Amino acid sequence: MESFEKLETLLGYSFKNKELLIEALSHPSLRQYHEYKYDKDYERLEFLGDAVLNLLITEILFKNFENYKEGNLAKIRSYLVCKETICIVGTKLALKDYIIMTHGEEVAGGRDNPNNIENVTEALIAAIYLDSNIEITHNIIEKLWAEFMKVQNLTDYDPKTALQEWAQASSNHLPIYRLIKREGAAHSSIFTVLVKVKDYEQICTGYSIKEAEKKAARCLLHRLKND
């Protein structure tokens, strides 16, 4: 496990209460072993962090996208707080190197498990909120999510809807999605999905069916528009 200084540098925030940081990084697998120093895990913080993230992302969108209607704002928010986006943020922070977990969880692939990375990212947001205030947390989220705020159109944040609308307008055919295969352990499976519109097909993979479908829709839409 890495020291916390590098993580705090990436965050742009230094914790006053390091125990909050430790709790946010502690995997629930630690509960079963008395010899571990930490008797708390990230689950409660994750619960709070999910709510804080949703609130602040909503506020940021409300202020920055003044001309967007509620429906479009809701779609953008769904994209910004979805598992895939949160995992990307957590991966850029290299959170897998900081998660405190049992050897058994690590051997089972726990450090690369998208669920763990998502959970720790949300727990970390809650820890920052409790250690500081809503304004500081707002600024950190705005910085970490900055590149995702550059959405240009529906394709960026809702490729499945964009593909469906394009397909209906161009060919009167709805996209058809099919799960081709699932590989890997139950907690870290990789899904391969095919999407088809008329005679065009696209295959993509993801850590969830939803992620794979979004990737496939985005790639196929790009092909169709440039064909």
Swiss-Prot record:
GO cellular component: cytoplasm
EC number from the UniProt entry: 3.1.26.3
Key words, A-Z: Cytoplasm, Endonuclease, Hydrolase, Magnesium, Metal-binding, mRNA processing, Nuclease, RNA-binding, rRNA processing, rRNA-binding, tRNA processing
Residues of the RNase III domain: 4-133
Active-site residues per Swiss-Prot or TrEMBL entry: 50, 122
Pfam families tied to this protein: dsrm (PF00035), Ribonucleas_3_3 (PF14622)
InterPro entries registered for this protein in UniProt: dsRBD_dom (IPR014720), RNase_III (IPR011907), RNase_III_dom (IPR000999), RNase_III_sf (IPR036389)
The keyword Cytoplasm is annotated on this UniProt entry: yes
Enzymatic reactions: Endonucleolytic cleavage to 5'-phosphomonoester
Cofactor(s) needed for function: Mg(2+)
Disulfide bonds: none
Molecular function via GO: double-stranded RNA binding; metal ion binding; ribonuclease III activity; rRNA binding
Single GO biological process annotation from the record: regulation of gene expression
Ranges where the DRBM domain occurs: 158-226
Presence of keyword RNA-binding: yes
Cell compartment(s), UniProt: Cytoplasm
SUPFAM superfamilies, A to Z: dsRNA-binding domain-like, RNase III domain-like
Function: Digests double-stranded RNA. Involved in the processing of primary rRNA transcript to yield the immediate precursors to the large and small rRNAs (23S and 16S). Processes some mRNAs, and tRNAs when they are encoded in the rRNA operon. Processes pre-crRNA and tracrRNA of type II CRISPR loci if present in the organism.
Quaternary structure (record): Homodimer.
Record-stated family: Belongs to the ribonuclease III family.
Entry-linked HAMAP family: RNase_III
PANTHER family: RIBONUCLEASE 3 (PTHR11207:SF0), RIBONUCLEASE III (PTHR11207)
Name of the protein in question: Ribonuclease 3
Gene name, Swiss-Prot/TrEMBL: rnc
